[in-house]
Amino acid sequence: MTDTPTKQEIQSKNDNVPAATPVEQKKNNRNDRKRNRRGDSKNLERDSDWQERVVQIRRVSKTVKGGKKMSFRAIVVVGNEKGQVGVGVGKAGDVIGAVRKGVSDGKKNLVRVPLTPNNSIPTLSLGSDGAANVLIRPAAPGTGVIAGGSIRTVLELAGIKNVLAKRLGSKTPLNNARAAMVALSQLRTHKSVSRERGISLEQLYS
């Protein structure tokens, strides 16, 4: 039968194991700090590409059993000015929380916009949401963004520099922003249209 080691023998073996030196601990701490800095810098680069603009903040109330519950509603437009834009709505008990929820909601509802070399849109488009209708059409270089209100914010954060927009119907900021998003989502490039119709670009322009 083999002799089982006693507690004193096990303790003596553990005592003989060399512990990490202070120099090694410092090196490990430095490596961990470098990794954390790299991760933070990557996250900052990703977040720096996106811009956020608050279109409207309203104080709303909800009738519950105990009375009225007050909260804030924020309409936020998020975009990277490179062809991606989104509109979000957030509700919270404070303004900062409502804006934060609106930003996260806007990033969940992003739309890709095909941009021309002149930072305009390829074709005319009409979008509607509720009683709001928004008409957007391409413009020549140097025209700028001819739009107002929440429609202008959506177009600017999408990266469009030359465009004409017309608001038809309702004047509410949320409906107009969503109508502009619908109009942008319906845009298609000339190549995609010619591919769907089975004709060349020359035949499409003629």
From Swiss-Prot:
<comment type="function">
    <text>Located at the back of the 30S subunit body where it stabilizes the conformation of the head with respect to the body.</text>
</comment>
<comment type="similarity">
    <text>Belongs to the universal ribosomal protein uS5 family.</text>
</comment>
<dbReference type="Pfam" id="PF00333">
    <property type="entry name" value="Ribosomal_S5"/>
</dbReference>
<keyword id="KW-0699">rRNA-binding</keyword>
<feature type="compositionally biased region" description="Basic and acidic residues">
    <location>
        <begin position="38"/>
        <end position="50"/>
    </location>
</feature>
<dbReference type="Pfam" id="PF03719">
    <property type="entry name" value="Ribosomal_S5_C"/>
</dbReference>
<dbReference type="InterPro" id="IPR013810">
    <property type="entry name" value="Ribosomal_uS5_N"/>
</dbReference>
<dbReference type="InterPro" id="IPR018192">
    <property type="entry name" value="Ribosomal_uS5_N_CS"/>
</dbReference>
<comment type="function">
    <text>With S4 and S12 plays an important role in translational accuracy.</text>
</comment>
<comment type="subunit">
    <text>Part of the 30S ribosomal subunit. Contacts proteins S4 and S8.</text>
</comment>
<dbReference type="GO" id="GO:0006412">
    <property type="term" value="P:translation"/>
</dbReference>
<dbReference type="InterPro" id="IPR000851">
    <property type="entry name" value="Ribosomal_uS5"/>
</dbReference>
<feature type="compositionally biased region" description="Polar residues">
    <location>
        <begin position="1"/>
        <end position="15"/>
    </location>
</feature>
<feature type="domain" description="S5 DRBM">
    <location>
        <begin position="50"/>
        <end position="113"/>
    </location>
</feature>
<keyword id="KW-0687">Ribonucleoprotein</keyword>
<keyword id="KW-0694">RNA-binding</keyword>
<dbReference type="InterPro" id="IPR020568">
    <property type="entry name" value="Ribosomal_Su5_D2-typ_SF"/>
</dbReference>
<feature type="region of interest" description="Disordered">
    <location>
        <begin position="1"/>
        <end position="50"/>
    </location>
</feature>
<dbReference type="GO" id="GO:0015935">
    <property type="term" value="C:small ribosomal subunit"/>
</dbReference>
<protein>
    <recommendedName>
        <fullName>Small ribosomal subunit protein uS5</fullName>
    </recommendedName>
</protein>
<keyword id="KW-0689">Ribosomal protein</keyword>
<dbReference type="GO" id="GO:0003735">
    <property type="term" value="F:structural constituent of ribosome"/>
</dbReference>
<dbReference type="InterPro" id="IPR005324">
    <property type="entry name" value="Ribosomal_uS5_C"/>
</dbReference>
<dbReference type="GO" id="GO:0019843">
    <property type="term" value="F:rRNA binding"/>
</dbReference>
<dbReference type="InterPro" id="IPR005712">
    <property type="entry name" value="Ribosomal_uS5_bac-type"/>
</dbReference>
<dbReference type="InterPro" id="IPR014721">
    <property type="entry name" value="Ribsml_uS5_D2-typ_fold_subgr"/>
</dbReference>
